[in-house]
Amino acid sequence: SASSGESSGMWFGPRL
């Protein structure tokens, strides 16, 4: 959505 890892989903999640 807005996070840096929205594509992979391994950074922080959808939006943090």
Curated annotation (Swiss-Prot):
Does the keyword Magnesium belong to this entry?
Answer: no
The answer to whether the entry has keyword Nuclease is no
Give the sites modified to Leucine amide. 16
Name where it's found. Secreted
Q: Where is the signal peptide?
A: none
Keywords tagged on the record: Amidation, Neuropeptide, Secreted
Cysteine pairs bridged by disulfides in the record: none
Biological processes per GO annotation: neuropeptide signaling pathway
A molecular function (GO) held by this record is:
neuropeptide hormone activity
Instruction: Provide GO CC annotations from the record.
Output: extracellular region
- Function description: Myoactive.
Concerning its family, UniProt says: Belongs to the pyrokinin family.
What is the protein name given in its UniProt record? Pyrokinin-5
